[in-house]
Amino acid sequence: MHLIKLDKGSLKIDDKIEVNVNKEKRERTEAHHSATHLVHAALKRVLGDHVKQKGSLVDEHKLRFDFSHDESLSDKEISKIEDLVNQEILKNSAVSTKIMDLEDAKNSGAESLFGEKYEDQVRVLSIGEDDFSLELCGGTHISRTGDLGIFIITSQSSVASGIRRIEALSGP
């Protein structure tokens, strides 16, 4: 979220402004955003390829991830998901992006959001060893998985028929 505070006057196109970024808030939000990509990949590995992202929310306090799945997650499944994400975090692998043609990105196996419209050139995000997570994403991210700290799922719920939600934390 970007907030603008005007001390006086108004803004118009081509005006110069001073930008102040809350570094701590941005870094925590980046960490939770990056963690959502690891969560998505872990969910697919534990529950199956039918899992698709249906929504997410990231901020400096937590992450929320909505996904397609018909049943409540068992304690064993939650534990497996947490373990997979934390294994990638402990590897301290590089997080990288590259610009690719949309078709090349899809052919490489990069996940895209169903119904989302993309330009001909897209940004592909790779997280973890052997592209543990490979998705189209234009957001900001951490540099290495180790920057995430410990990951834990704090809750799960149903938000609609066939749509599950998990909330989680990542950090030191």
Identify what each model region corresponds to.
Residues 1-172:
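A glycine- and charged-residue-rich anion-binding loop/surface
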